[in-house]
């Protein structure tokens, strides 16, 4: 039933688009791309290697622009540009279709972040909204998860996350009685919340968008720092001890990991420097 509803919605969207005559759609399409290419550019010159870098940069922006304006963020494993092909697996050729993606359908933040940092510094701010939207709409679920699992406030962002906020099931584990994923590579890997907050703070500094700051950036960043403040014990007043913790995916057991400390210090310093009008 859900798949038939999706097909019906897709058909309605196509029908709405078909109502726009090609004679009108084509000029609007061309104007969009003209505006896109003239709002920022880099054309390195001097050597063939420099020119090759420039072509790669332009291609990367084109790929991102073609995929970044949908309802969801760009998928790191193929984006819109998945293709038919073959995979050599232990000497066996295995067919797969254009909708097949290695690593599945979740968002892995370490990979998802890459095109969005590039958009930020290219000035392609409008293309970042699907990423903000996904996390903004996941906040109620993330708050409820923290309350249910750990009996305190705040939010933590999973490294492998469905659009609605929860872990990839294969990482969390079927019939897992614990509140931590069974996959050791992401069991306590929550650094993405700090980096996401940092990206949002940069976005606000670039754009000055106060509505974004009030409705997206501050609720998410506040939820992240609240989680760290309430989840970990204090060794003395005002001094938390981040353990047990992780350092990226690399070190599965860590105490006071460097990325967590630097992330929190940076984000908290920047949050405290925001104007009072945003509070």
Predicted features by range, described:
Residues 4, 76-105, 157-215, 226-279:
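The feature captures the catalytic groove of carbohydrate-active enzymes
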Residues 6-9, 29, 49, 56, ...:
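Stable alpha-helical elements in mature extracytoplasmic
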Residues 54-56, 105-109, 118, 232-233:
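A general structural signal for short secondary-structure junctions and capping/turn motifs
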């Amino acid at each position: 039933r859900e798949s038939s509803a999706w097909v019906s919605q897709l058909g309605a969207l196509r029908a709405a688009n078909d109502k726009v005559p090609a004679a009108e759609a084509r000029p609007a399409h061309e104007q969009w791309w003209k505006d896109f290419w003239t709002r920022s550019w880099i054309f390195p010159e001097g050597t063939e290697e420099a020119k090759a870098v420039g072509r790669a940069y332009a291609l990367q922006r084109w790929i991102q622009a073609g995929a970044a304006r949908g309802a969801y963020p760009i998928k790191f494993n193929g984006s819109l540009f998945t293709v038919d092909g073959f995979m050599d697996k232990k000497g066996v050729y295995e067919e797969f279709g254009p909708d097949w993606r290695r690593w599945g359908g979740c968002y892995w933040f370490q990979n998802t972040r890459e095109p969005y940092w590039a958009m930020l510094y290219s000035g392609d701010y409008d293309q970042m909204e699907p990423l903000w939207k996904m996390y903004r709409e996941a906040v109620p679920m993330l708050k409820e998860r923290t309350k249910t699992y750990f009996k305190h406030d705040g939010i933590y962002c999973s490294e492998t996350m469905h659009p609605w906020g929860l872990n990839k099931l294969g990482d969390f584990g079927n019939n897992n009685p614990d509140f931590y994923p069974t996959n050791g590579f992401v069991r306590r890997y929550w650094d993405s919340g700090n980096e996401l907050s940092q990206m949002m703070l940069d976005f606000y500094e670039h754009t000055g968008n106060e509505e974004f700051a009030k409705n997206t950036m501050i609720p998410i960043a506040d939820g992240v720092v609240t989680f760290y403040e309430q989840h970990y014990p204090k060794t003395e007043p005002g001094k938390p001890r981040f353990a047990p913790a992780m350092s990226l995916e690399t070190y599965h057991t860590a105490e006071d990991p460097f990325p967590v400390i630097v992330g929190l210090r940076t984000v908290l310093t920047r949050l405290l420097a925001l104007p009072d009008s945003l509070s």
